[in-house]
UniProtKB/Swiss-Prot annotation:
Pathway: Cell wall biogenesis; peptidoglycan biosynthesis. Belongs to the aspartate/glutamate racemases family. The lineage of its organism: Bacteria, Pseudomonadati, Pseudomonadota, Alphaproteobacteria, Hyphomicrobiales. Keywords: Cell shape, Cell wall biogenesis/degradation, Isomerase, Peptidoglycan synthesis. GO terms for molecular function: glutamate racemase activity. NCBIfam families: glut_race. It catalyses: L-glutamate = D-glutamate. InterPro entries: Asp/Glu/hydantoin_racemase (IPR015942), Asp/Glu_race (IPR001920), Asp/Glu_racemase_AS_1 (IPR018187), Asp/Glu_racemase_AS_2 (IPR033134), Glu_race (IPR004391). It comes from Brucella ovis (strain ATCC 25840 / 63/290 / NCTC 10512). The keyword Nucleotidyltransferase does not apply. This is Glutamate racemase. Provides the (R)-glutamate required for cell wall biosynthesis.
Amino acid sequence: MKKAPAGSFPAKPTIAPERPILVFDSGIGGLTVLREARVVMPDRRFVYIADDAGFPYGNWEEEALKRRIIELFGEFIANYDPEIAVIACNTASTLVLEDLRRAYPSVPFVGTVPAIKPAAERTSSGLVSVLATPGTVKRAYTRDLIQSFASRCHVRLVGVDGLAAIAEAHIRGESFDEALVMAQIAPCFIEKGGKRTDIVVLACTHYPFLVNVLRRLAPWPVDWLDPAEAIARRMKSLLPARSDDDEFHSQDDLAFFTSRKPDYAIRRLMQGFGLRF
């Protein structure tokens, strides 16, 4: 039997590069989902992508926006080879999620849709409002959710323009008109038959950044329902469990902006979230 040459050792197992979780939004709102995902999956690697060159999505014609997102994901998948992709944007999810699944069947996609089912389960008064972009409000998908899960509730859809942009200004530390915010959320608050709205669904991932402002401006206390935690749990459920023997190259979490020129405030924000450009 041949002896191994002196000084030789068994070959080390190959350490695979870690496939990241890709979190996508039109701007910085998806950071609310990333934050919860890191709590649920602290050992995973993330790439955060903001389509700031296309922001805000509410200004787009639907077919043009659909084509844009599908084409962008072709580049993202080729560049990052994600283990899973999260559409951390209600507008994009209700528009293009199924098309993305058909276009890229090898990648699991998780969408962000209005949290109407949990709202219907939690409400005591039966009066629920959904605060969203006009695009999310007008989609048949949103109405189907109401019909399927909240048919016994009175659900008011409130579509607002500009609140996502106000959230971006707020997170940058810029001033904004609180009277405008108050006017936009006012239709969410209904009094009917001696009962009041008790849940407002935040159906845009930007809005949780404003939640303290919303609480202060609201005419009475409500549960502002943020779906980020549920999205994070769904992501984890679709990923294979890791064992203690799994080894991966340690790599930084990344941020990519489609404009390729995020300003100083955004760069600071991304660094605060532990994201490298």
